[in-house]
């Protein structure tokens, strides 16, 4: 009875923390979506869909520290299991986490392959005023059916794809791999779900390489460099207006005597008049920003922004160094591409892999660090998306602007962030493989010692950090790790993706260093949906 009560207490602690994270996530998603959605084109359904899909992704990531916490707290620091942690209780705890993953991953599949596409196509059809609601729903369902078919194919392939590994590899290593995956289960339903989620994670990896890697270098450098002075930009703009007005006056003077203008002059006049309208619109925006209290407040916070920029670039360098050492470890010590570069433990230590187990001894510091890492990925991804925009090959589909993002763009944004957040679980594993696999678990090993006072040798049990050499019944592997490595070919793709991530980060760092300061109205003159009577994207 006492054993059951202690186990329940441990579960309550873990899930209470998860509940607090859940509330924080919902609040963050609401603020985040409301900040970027268009004030003029705000739609209730698209807003709720965006908030819900982003929240589901973040909640799934929040399961990672819960998973690690539960497997770690089943054991004492001396390597022994706690009194309540017998085989049945341990299995019950592991199944609880597994069912949590089942539920959340199923909801993610529903969002990605049905709900988000349906809402997106519904609003695409809504732009046509002549279309009835019934027709809009039918058309949206017709297009969504294609996504449902893709999901069904992924589930079928995942359920029956062979997982046989090459026979020319070390048999001991593969026995260990097989025994680990047997813990996760061998049902076709689980394999289908794992394959589908891994496919989405692979797309998330491509999004992370495109947006997160660039944003990780662009965000801190933009904070450090700041923006150009509104007063100086306004002075330059005034000079440009005077110059364009002189050109217009010169061209118009040619027709004072009643002679018609040549075709070339007409084209030039039209271009100058269009340029003048743009410059006057910029003048209004710059005047508003120069006189706003928000600009003065941001100017007072300039030193703080520089400090944050330096902090973010140091964090980025910490991540890059940890990721490089982890990938180098796999390149040197894993079984190769046919095994998905799976490696047990860490032969080359990296800063984060050493830091996280230490923080876990002081609850809940590791939760805080994992949350910071996930939020850092979110903010840098958003910075990358804002700088690059949403593209389909060479065609720019949408721009993300504060207070001016259309419902369709908002759905695209949350879809990309959902996929990136899915990939963060593997990124965290890449940064701290030992922590994600075993947490802070220890196990006991027998060591022979020789004593001068007593003849012969004696045996002493000493704790050791859990690794691949530990007996199967002494260390519990997290469910997260098993989900991530169910299919070796995805692990191989993630490995090469990490190298691409490092390369894009370095390229982005060079590009961001070479770029000058941004305009205070960056992107305003590009936005076709800005009316002349609206002062600025920063007016909110």
Swiss-Prot record:
Impact reported for residue 457 to Q: Affects glycosylation status. Affects glycosylation status
Pfam families (UniProt xref): LMBR1
Membrane-spanning segments: 11-31, 51-71, 101-121, 145-165, 189-209, 306-326, 365-385, 409-429, 487-507
Domain of life of the native organism: Eukaryota
Residue numbers covered by motif WTKF motif: 294-297
Motif (YERL motif): 232-235
Cell compartments where the protein resides: Endoplasmic reticulum membrane; Lysosome membrane; Cell membrane; Cytoplasmic vesicle, Clathrin-coated vesicle
Modified positions (Phosphoserine) in chain numbering: 528, 531
Topology of this chain in the membrane: Multi-pass membrane protein
Linked pathology: Methylmalonic aciduria and homocystinuria, cblF type: An autosomal recessive disorder of cobalamin metabolism characterized by decreased levels of the coenzymes adenosylcobalamin (AdoCbl) and methylcobalamin (MeCbl). It is due to accumulation of free cobalamin in lysosomes, thus hindering its conversion to cofactors. Clinical features include developmental delay, stomatitis, glossitis, seizures and methylmalonic aciduria responsive to vitamin B12.
Protein's name according to its UniProt entry: Lysosomal cobalamin transport escort protein LMBD1
Organism: Homo sapiens
Gene field: LMBRD1
